C-alpha cells in the first residue's frame, strides 16, 4: 500500500517500523501463496473448488490491476502480487475443470464455465481500473482489496453451508487464507498509526466495519468447518 504513496516522504516514525510492515506484507504473501498452491493441488486432484466464482474473478482482476496497470513501487508488494497473479491463472484453469463436475446439474454453467470466468474477470478488472481512475490507485487498491476480502469470506462461508461438506476445503486452506488476511490487517494498522497523514483514513467507520465483518465471517467459517468435519467423522464411524 505504501508503494502507491511515492509522492509523500514517509515520516521518521514509519521508517522505524517499515521493516515490520514489510514483514507482514511478506506474511500476507506467504499465507495466500500457500492457499493458492493448495487450491491448485485440490483442483488437479478432481476435488471441488473452494472459492466461489465471483470472488475468484474479483481476486484475479484486482491482482491484474495492481501488477500490470498500476504496479506498486514497493518491491515486496509487487513480488507478492506477481506470484499471486501467476498462481491465480492455474486456479482459474482448475476452477473451470471443477465446474464441469460440480455444476453438472446446470449445463449452462458447467459447459460454459471458462467463458463465464473470462467475462467475470474482465468485468471486475475494468471495474478496478475505473475505480483507480476515479479515486486514485492508492485508495482504490485498498477499497478494492476490501471488496475482494468480503466477497471471498462471505461467499466462502455460504458455499460451505450450501455444500454441507468439507469437499474442496481443509483446515490448512482456511488457516492460510485467514492468517494471510490478518497480516494484511497488521501492516495496514502500522501504516495507519505511524503514517496518519496518508493512511489515517484506514481508521474510518466503513473500514472498521469491513474489518469486523471479515473477522466474523472467517471465524464463522472456521466454526462451521469444525461442525461439518465433526459430522462427517461421526457418519464415517457409523458405517
Swiss-Prot record:
Coiled-coil zones: none
Topology with respect to the bilayer: Multi-pass membrane protein
A GO cellular-component term linked to this record: membrane
Enzyme class label: lyase
Pathway in which this enzyme or protein is active: Secondary metabolite biosynthesis
EC numbers, comma separated: 4.2.3.-
Mutant lacking the gene: phenotype: Simultaneous disruption of idtB, idtC, idtF and idtG eliminates the biosynthesis of the whole spectrum of indole-diterpenes reported to be produced by C.paspali, including paspaline, paxilline, paspalinine, paspalitrem A and paspalitrem B.
InterPro entries named in the record: PaxB-like
Record has Lyase as a keyword: yes
Annotated GO MF terms: lyase activity
Protein's cellular compartments: Membrane
Superkingdom field: Eukaryota
Annotated glycan sites: 164
TM region(s), chain numbering: 20-40, 50-70, 75-95, 113-133, 138-158, 197-217
UniProt keywords, alphabetically: Glycoprotein, Lyase, Membrane, Transmembrane, Transmembrane helix
Keyword flag Membrane: yes
Primary location class: membrane
Family per record: Belongs to the paxB family.
Entry function: Terpene cyclase; part of the gene cluster that mediates the biosynthesis of paspalitrems, indole-diterpene (IDT) mycotoxins that are potent tremorgens in mammals. The geranylgeranyl diphosphate (GGPP) synthase idtG is proposed to catalyze the first step in IDT biosynthesis via catalysis of a series of iterative condensations of isopentenyl diphosphate (IPP) with dimethylallyl diphosphate (DMAPP), geranyl diphosphate (GPP), and farnesyl diphosphate (FPP), to form GGPP. Condensation of indole-3-glycerol phosphate with GGPP by the prenyltransferase idtC then forms 3-geranylgeranylindole (3-GGI).
Name of protein: Terpene cyclase idtB
Organism: Claviceps paspali
Source organism phylogeny: Eukaryota, Fungi, Dikarya, Ascomycota, Pezizomycotina
Gene that this sequence comes from: idtB
